[in-house]
Amino acid sequence: MMITLTGHTLTVEEMKRLLLEGEGVTACPTSMQKVAECREVVEKIVEDGKVVYGITTGFGKFSDVLIQKDDVKALQHNLIQSHACGIGDPFPEEVSRGMLILRANTMLKGVSGVRPLVVNMLLEFVNRKIHPVVPQQGSLGASGDLAPLSHLALVLLGEGEVFYKGKRVHAMVALTEEGLEPIELEAKEGLALINGTQAMTAQGVLSYIEAEATAYQAELIASMTIEGLQGIIDAFDENVHKARGYKEQVDVASRIRDILHDSKLTTKQGELRVQDAYSLRCIPQVHGASWQVLNYVKEKLEIEMNAATDNPLIFDGGEKVISGGNFHGQPIAFAMDFLKVGMAELANISERRIERLVNPQLNDLPPFLSPEPGLQSGAMIMQYAAASLVSENKTLAHPASVDSIPSSANQEDHVSMGTIASRHAHQIIQNVRRVLSIEMICAMQAAEYRGIENMSTVTKSFYHQGRQQVPSITNDRIFSTDIENIAHWLKASDSIKERLDVNAAL
């Protein structure tokens, strides 16, 4: 099934299908007509010799240098080559695929001035699964993602490298095998390709997709811990959460009640104790607040996915060609920094639940869930590992968006650092997943001491799925492998909505 790009309607759900399920794209004919009409304006500007930034002038600090008509093509090619200054490891292939999709989508708004040929070439790369190799480092997030997008533009010209059929090859290898000809950029097209926020946004979309799945999984894993610690179910009563009024908090409490509705391991207020520690009792409040962050981030991503972030932009049939600053990544920089904090908190509270599972002073379980306390250490060092990841997240959660370093001889004197924020958000999510994996391993072990038959229908199903990934702890072993196995499984599971056999959970 193909997803139609219009420049206005792309959603996160569609991006999920495009990035993770490999669906193809096509362009809306009406939007393509707008692209063609806008291109005519650019060609007339060049023909008439008008002075317009980025079309007949240099770039950045060189904006006052007039470019002769015969040099317009060379200007675009020089721009791409000189700006391809990315460094470091490449973005995940899903991100570079997302960059192609988002760049095509923004051009389909019909205000960038490129030829339809350029849009079609981007779509060909998506549909043939030719994905640019794009280094992760080197973007200031204004003027957009210049370096990363230059590496994307290179491959359209038959230069640079691509991921193709599971290999990293020169772009011309893939183009030749697919029977495609590299394109030669004309006026404005180089700038239109690289002036935008598509690297930070593509990475942000992938991060959001993973974060959403992780947040659902965190609720299910926390529910297993509640059982392992014989938590008090009253704290999740609907009346408590409606009294505060946050929808996300109410929803988390509702899902946990559904997950645990037939559990024989939860307790009532006063049965074993009057109240639980915050890491159990306040799960809806804390996880719910993280869902508030996720909802905010999704809203901003969907705006940016359909935004014209080029410069200059062309309006009213060419009557207005305006230099603006839509390439500035501040909205996504803030959103990604917010995502970092919201997701890091899920690991913070998870690590505290891990401590309650392994600390014999806080429960009546075997110390560190060890099969032979003293002779065998059990889950002792797993808690250390979780604490390390949580601490690392606190460093990564420092806002990238509060920094700015002037560039281009102070012409570009304020930048967003949004791509750094996006990259760090993705790193944090990987760490969160591993912390949750440790909690799950400990919660499964605690469930065995409590009696698996007493678990809820939902958590029991999840327990058995988890045990297919890692065995019960009967002896000390290399737990690093267990943690990674659960983490990989959770990532592949997408979300508990899709993974569980029992629909009662959600």
Swiss-Prot record:
Gene Ontology biological-process entries: L-histidine catabolic process; L-histidine catabolic process to glutamate and formamide; L-histidine catabolic process to glutamate and formate
Keywords, comma-separated and alphabetical: Cytoplasm, Histidine metabolism, Lyase
Keyword Lyase: yes
Organism: Bacillus cereus (strain ATCC 14579 / DSM 31 / CCUG 7414 / JCM 2152 / NBRC 15305 / NCIMB 9373 / NCTC 2599 / NRRL B-3711)
Gene that encodes the chain: hutH
PROSITE patterns linked to this entry: PAL_HISTIDASE
2,3-didehydroalanine (Ser) carried by residues: 143
EC number(s) recorded for this UniProt protein: 4.3.1.3
Pathway of action: Amino-acid degradation; L-histidine degradation into L-glutamate; N-formimidoyl-L-glutamate from L-histidine: step 1/3
Top-tier EC class: lyase
PANTHER family: HISTIDINE AMMONIA-LYASE
Position(s), cross-link 5-imidazolinone (Ala-Gly): 142-144
Catalytic activity as recorded in UniProt: L-histidine = trans-urocanate + NH4(+)
Protein name, entry field: Histidine ammonia-lyase
Source taxon at top rank: Bacteria
Post-translational modification: Contains an active site 4-methylidene-imidazol-5-one (MIO), which is formed autocatalytically by cyclization and dehydration of residues Ala-Ser-Gly.
GO cellular component, one term: cytoplasm
Pfam families given in the database record: Lyase_aromatic
Subcellular location: Cytoplasm
InterPro entries referenced in this protein's UniProt entry, alphabetically: Aromatic_Lyase, Fumarase/histidase_N, HutH, L-Aspartase-like, Phe/His_NH3-lyase_AS
UniProt GO MF annotations: histidine ammonia-lyase activity
Family the UniProt entry places it in: Belongs to the PAL/histidase family.
